[in-house]
């Protein structure tokens, strides 16, 4: 696949991660065995606001890792960025699940967070030639 095709695929992923209610995970939801929340409206609203910020961070992490993976020159670096992005998908899924539990939505700015982070990741790795990333 050429660079343009890869870039188009990444745009598609970005839209899915930032707009869809992504809930596919490889690890169990950490709150699955916790009792039902008995939050009043103020607590629920505050919790949802905090979770929306957390969700935005997870969307941005996807963009950063995906951008770095796209432009990394070394295959090992690309693999590590792909693996990091894959691990972060669980966090994104958990944030979506919690927002659903709180009857809330993610930020409308999620596509912007993804796009800006993707751009930063792509630009940062275009010029780096480090042999490995610290583990």
Question: Where do the language-model regions lie?
Answer:
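Alpha-helical scaffold segments that form or flank carboxylate-/histidine-based iron centers
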Residues: 45-56, 75-90
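Terminal targeting/low-complexity segments that flank the catalytic cores of oxidoreductases
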Residues: 1-55
